A protein has these predicted regions:
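Polyanionic (Asp/Glu-rich) segments that form extended negatively charged tracts
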Residues: 1-209
């Protein structure tokens, strides 16, 4: 019975005169809010040809969605991942409700050629992020242990910094010893602040630098 009451609206646009993204944003503001990740996905895909949409979705966006999901809860962390990604790229921390706006401001795609390199980089970093939210996916036991300790201490404000360090390790800019030192320093720093009574919420700006 509920499906029988479902209504669809088809809007015809003129490619040269109408801005589909702006129309979509206007429609979205009148109904149930989409997540920041949903808005970014639509922004990324909307202006592409169908063949390019399929390629970007299948090769990049779908893997990003899968990798940025918690194994235990099946909770999507795509919005959080992109927020952390933007934090270390811009050295500014986006408001949780304005991640889409910040992403759109930084990446104004004109075509498939300008979009694909960004999606390639996002896909590379989400592979690191997957190990932060799912430490069991990290194959190295020592690294896995340090990530679990960081998560146990709930120092997720360090994620933007760790993503950069992890990528250096992945690209062999640093070795495993340096990675472990960085992960241990994060914990030591958090404990020292806790002991002297300093709030943990201020650490995000420190790690951002």
């Amino acid at each position: 019975k509920g499906i029988a009451k479902l209504m669809f609206v088809q809007i015809s646009l003129e490619r040269k005169n109408d801005d589909p993204q702006r129309i979509f944003e206007s429609l979205n503001s009148t109904g149930l809010d989409l997540s920041q990740a949903d808005l970014i996905r639509n922004y990324v895909l909307m202006g592409l040809k169908p063949s390019h949409q399929n390629k970007i979705y299948q090769n990049y966006w779908e893997p990003i969605e899968n990798l940025a999901t918690e194994n235990e809860t099946n909770k999507s962390r795509v919005s959080d991942f992109i927020r952390d990604y933007l934090t270390f790229k811009t050295r500014e921390i986006p408001n949780k409700n304005k991640v889409y706006q910040e992403f759109k401001c930084k990446y104004q795609f004109m075509d498939f050629v300008s979009l694909e390199p960004v999606m390639t980089e996002l896909k590379r970093y989400v592979m690191h992020y997957n190990k932060l939210i799912n430490p069991e996916n990290e194959t190295d036991g020592e690294v896995r242990r340090q990530i679990k300790l960081i998560n146990k201490l709930e120092i997720n404000v360090s994620y933007p910094f760790i993503l950069e360090v992890y990528d250096d390790y992945y690209r062999e800019v640093i070795n495993k010893e340096k990675l472990l030192q960085a992960l241990e320093l994060i914990q030591s720093f958090a404990w020292r602040r806790f002991i002297v009574g300093l709030p943990s919420n201020a650490m995000n700006k420190i790690f951002m630098r």
